[in-house]
């Protein structure tokens, strides 16, 4: 039995307040034949003086693989405070199961979420899908995935402006990895989520990442872009992030 631990340390430079309506599980998915995988990331910032800013972020994955079965648990948390006012205290957790069909797979997931930055008290998802490989050679690949999911959201709970939304959505996503040189590669993901009975209501997530590999770690930069065509409360429909960081891989048998 093989065990593997992967530690990620990130430096975060936010362009806007982060919207966590769509979660990219691909970026935390370690490509490994290990039986167990644990991946974690931490980053933070403290500023004092004219402005007092506290920021802390953590993303974690625990994965178990047996034969063609893969079970993954994702837990993410973000906290931002400015002048002792909480701007963000957001969490996302997702339990995901995948069954491999050679280069393809079927999957199911359940997800829970809270996002103060979006006035989102709770968001619960249940979904299934199919992932198809279109191209694969060495580390280069192109996959697409499609599946429906159930969405239950509560905004501004316990207020006169509370909004409770139940949707059924279709999710279409693509996953692309291209090896530029022996040590430099590009990984890009794209998610498109469409409301089943209102095609004017859709969400988009786009994240390209450039990574450079050294002997025992990688450095990278990535841009995260999110868009919701019809927000259900008075918030911005677009947000983005620019991140720089490195990963360190520690493994043992």
Residue ranges and their predicted role:
Residues 212, 238-253:
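Outer-membrane beta-barrel "beta-signal"
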């Amino acid at each position: 039995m093989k065990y593997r631990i992967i530690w990620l340390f990130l430096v975060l430079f936010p362009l806007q307040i982060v919207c966590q309506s769509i979660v990219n599980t691909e970026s935390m998915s370690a490509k490994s034949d290990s039986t167990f995988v644990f991946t974690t990331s931490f980053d933070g910032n403290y500023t004092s003086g004219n402005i007092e800013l506290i920021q802390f972020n953590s993303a974690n994955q625990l994965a178990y693989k047996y034969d063609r079965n893969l079970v993954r648990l994702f837990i993410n948390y973000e906290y931002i405070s400015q002048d002792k006012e909480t701007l963000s205290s957001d969490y996302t957790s997702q339990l995901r199961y995948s069954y491999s069909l050679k280069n393809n797979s079927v999957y199911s997931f359940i997800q829970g979420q809270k996002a103060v930055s979006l006035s989102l008290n709770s968001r619960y998802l249940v979904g299934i899908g199919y992932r198809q490989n279109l191209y694969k050679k060495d580390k280069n690949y192109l996959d697409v995935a499609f599946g429906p999911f159930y969405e239950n959201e509560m905004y501004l709970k316990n207020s006169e402006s509370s909004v409770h939304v139940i949707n059924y959505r279709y999710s279409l996503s693509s996953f692309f990895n291209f090896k530029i040189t022996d040590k430099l590669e590009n990984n890009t993901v794209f998610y498109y989520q469409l409301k089943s009975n209102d095609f004017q209501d859709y969400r988009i997530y786009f994240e390209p990442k450039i990574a450079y590999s050294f002997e025992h770690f990688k450095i990278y930069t990535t841009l995260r872009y999110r868009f919701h065509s019809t927000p259900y409360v008075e918030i911005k429909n677009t947000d983005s992030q620019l991140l720089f960081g490195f990963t360190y891989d520690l493994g043992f048998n």
